[in-house]
Amino acid sequence: MNLFRLVPIFLLAAGTAFAQTPAASPADDSKPTPPQVNKSFDLSAMDKTADPCTDFYQYACGNWVKSNPIPADQVRWARSFSLLRERNRFLLWQELDAAAKDPKTPLQKQYGDFYAACMDTATVEEKGLAPIKPAWGEIADLPSAKQLPGLLSKLENIGTPDGFFEFGVDQDEKDSTQQIAEIYQGGLSLPDRDYYIVDSPRFKTIRAEYIEHKKKMFTLAGDTPEQAATEAAAVMEIETAMAKTSTSRTDLRQPENRYHIYTLVDFEKMTPAIDWNTYFHTIGIGHFDTLNVATPDFFKALNSMVQSEPIDSWKSYLRWHVLHGQAQELSKAFFDENFDFFGRTLQGQKEPEARWKQCSTMTDRALGEAVGQDWVKQNFPPEAKNSMDKLVAALEKSLGDDIKALPWMSDETKKAAEEKLSMIRNKIGYPEKWRDYSSVKVRRTDLIGNTHASAVYERDYNFAKLGKPVDEKEWGMTPPTVNAYYSPSFNDINFPAGILQPPFFDFKVDPAVNFGGIGVVIGHEMTHGFDDQGSKFDGKGDLREWQTPADRKAFTERTDCVAKEYDGFEAAPAHGDVAEQKLNGKLTLGENTADNGGLRIAYMALLDTLAAQGNSIDEKIDGYTEAQRYFIGFAQVWCQNQTEQSARQSALVDPHSPGKWRVNGSVQNFDAFGKAFGCKQGQPMYPVNSCRVW
């Protein structure tokens, strides 16, 4: 039911920050220890032998990159995000562990029991495959493809993953006050459609390994080798057919490509082989006459597949998606095989995360605002919110000044842009009103039952929005999250408490470092309101053109410059028969535009702040001017190491560029950087011709 929406737009890849790891490892003797968070500005992280005008990322981060290899349980390790995430997760673990042992409130008992059930590996092992047997029993009884929709609703009603497609309720992108039914493509287990349809040596190898993985999983579940091979082949055939008709991530970034309003009658006519009436009437959603079919071609193809694929193939497909979807919560044999392929093979991760880490993350995902209430009380001081309010106001002023000064934009469009900026809502720290999880029944000895209860709660919470006014105070992240996001349909920016601390935000450092850290994050999120996606939504959050045709043309010319520039950046090198992996400038365009704009407007805000204090951008601290400290502080946010496998996957699925290019790509488009470091025009970080949107 998790919709394949590319909004809200996150500072990092949504949901998992950097490490995309399984949910819980079955065996773990490690003891939690509090991680050391880095300073906001660290001279020891720098490689002073590097030329900042040639490779600023190496100059600002080189020593850190050299001295901080990727931990065995991670696929990407970042100086700021990863270490702060680990610190927040340690604090979260302290809260959960205490609640599991001695809960003081009903809320603590609920999330304490959820965490305890996850940590109870003995019970998980004892149950083995039993928790998914009821779902498999329903699948085995499926008489024909005509009854598929009824079966899907049964599986969803008990919280079991089933693949196929994604259905739920979200804002109407052309009337953001309304919430409508939406249906999206889905059904794939591999990270992206390219894994199924691109005929490169690398993808052919991955497909072969994926088939072997499925065979092993089916064998563990009781199939003979022959049965497992037949089932694995059937799943591969169906998923490949779905991949061939799936819309690309790049195309789905543009809202007009995913907005197709159908009457329910017309949708049923388009897909007559699928009994939507049964599905919609048995999953517990209210009445609706129209819906947004985000990917019509996918559903036309699915209709044909339902008619042509044998019923046994559909049974194998559904058995697989239940098994794959729950493998991380099953006994050790299933967990290990799942990790071996999706963690080790696909991403280069050497070992699973510690059990306590994964159970902390799982509990936060399932009961985030329950856990978050107590987390905020312990870890988010009121003065942090007050300081953020001031920083946000400073950045809003700078973006307004930037809009006024743009030479390529007409006065008519500037007025509309300023109006949209004035309407942005800021959410800082945590929700004003917490969710009520009292209907989620948690059992201390039933991990999968708890995940099912959470899934049903989230689905029903979403379905209840149908036809109701939008709740503008709702959050899309939990308080401990180290991330931030902008929502075009809400026209709001959201900064969870988790990111509002060192090294991003530090009361004790000079303004240059804070503006280079959290200031650029704020500017980044604001700029999303005016990137190639956000600029298509007005101040109310409606999908509506507010630029003149001439200004839209000028805007597109500038964003095309950025896309072409980032197309040339390397994500992973060539070796053997594996080709070089370049970034996708169109996929990453929104994030790159926001990085560039955020760097510029945060610098403008710093200049205003220093001037108001009677200080100069050229004053030195520890041998560096405030301008230089600003850029170094910004760069050190993005110091990172990443496995090659993860880097290649990210280049296909992640709209964010790697840290190196978030730094070098941004500074080379900002003349103030070249001047701050005395670069000569024509050097790599101070080119004669550069790209600028905002």
Residue ranges with predicted function:
Residues 7-16:
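Bacterial N-terminal signal peptides
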Residues 1-7:
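Bacterial N-terminal signal peptides that target proteins for export
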Residues 46-66, 196, 200-219, 589, ...:
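Hydrophobic/aromatic-rich, well-ordered segments within soluble, folded domains that form packed cores
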Residues 32-34, 235, 265, 269-274, ...:
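Intrinsically disordered, low-complexity linker/terminal regions across diverse proteins
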Residues 32-35, 50-126:
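Active-site-surrounding "flap" and adjacent substrate/cofactor-binding loops of secreted or lumenal enzymes
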Residues 17-19, 23-27:
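Boundary at the C-terminal end of the N-terminal hydrophobic targeting segment
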Residues 97-394:
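Noncatalytic, helix-rich "gating/capping" subdomain that lines the substrate-entry/channel surface
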Residues 28-44:
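Short, Gly/Pro- and small/polar-rich lid/capping loops
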